[in-house]
Amino acid sequence: MVSLLNTGGVSMGLGPSIKMTTLHHYQCPLTNALANDPDFEFTGIIVDGVSEVCDDKIYTAKRVGDIGQMLRADAAVVAIDAWGNHHVDFVNVIEQLGIRGIPSVGLSYIAQQGRLVCTNNFVDCVIDFNKSAAGYESCVVGENNLTDYDAMKAVALVKNKLRKAGKPVEEALDLGESVKLRRLLRKTFAIKEVKFGDTTSIDHGVLTIRKGIEKNLILQEDRIKDVTVSIVEPGNYDFFVNSNLDYSPIACKVRGELGEGVTHLLSGVTVMTTGVEDKSGFQPSNIGSSEGILKNQVVFDRAGTPKSTDYILHVDVLFEEGEGRTAEGIMAAHRVTDWIVQEIRKVLVNLDNMAYTREEFSDVAKPGKRKVVLVKIVSGLGNMYDTAMFPYEPGGFLGSHNMMDSKNIPYVITPNQCRDGVIHSLL
């Protein structure tokens, strides 16, 4: 049973410094670490939404446990980008996996501010990915992000847990050659310059964005008063930005469904969505907004933030008064951004005048190896506190389904689907 600790009350906890953006899930350090480890069969990812009501938290945690058991998991990694009330979901998931004989390694922001509000006997190994010396949540996007180093620690600790459970990876049987189940080919085209022009085009490393690309979109969204699109050159970060709503990649499907086939991706450019309400100037946020001078409000070169060498395609949304506090308003902002990116995708899908780097990813069955699952506990409470699944395009929003609308019932996705952008953060 989960036992509550004396914390003086349970609060929500998801701030700018720990949030996993769409870009973070697209470049997920845990997915990469587990998929690349030769000792594991990475059987899949369970995406579990945080619920509002305690009974629902327990219900979805039990379903995660059932899925883990169905996948014949020997161990699990459980990651969450929130604290406070969200930790009820976190410890319940670890408990339900443990009841079914699946030991877990957890990853969460803890530090001084995010200490667990509840616990149980199965919560015995949690990696604290706090990066702040003060140990407190901040309004700097990416400051307390889960990194490659955290993922490396998780892999090592999972092996230690398996050893204690009598299933050391060294003693796993070799039952034959690995079998590639699904193949994803990613072609990445490097962008060297981004500028405005008469039409949207990509030519020999230059991305041109049509002037006024956002104008017609404003008329489609009643909850949005205005949209401003600008281009931020690498290093030119000494200017004010409104609160961050997301960072996302520019990618498109050329062939196949998300997680297989061929995807085209642009490197050297990242999309940044920000927003503010008209009149009141309210900055959309949960426990802290991230508005301010850009160079002070983001840690670059993290999985969920742009590279310091990237151009940034900045989509700034002016909400009608009150709409930055509604689920519909936040979704409208993400819709507008995706429509803008969609115009770029229409060019990217047929791109043939540039060199590219080629990466091939496979979901792999490894007979006899220890089976490990990754559980991503994501927001599912609505407003700017939700997650959307399976958009039409990699990292997109159009066509997706919100976790809250799905009652936060867990999704099971493949590692390749995660790599191909099936998770979109509405944060």
What do the PLM-derived regions correspond to, one by one?
Residues 1-427:
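An N-terminal assembly and electron-transfer interface module characteristic of large anaerobic redox
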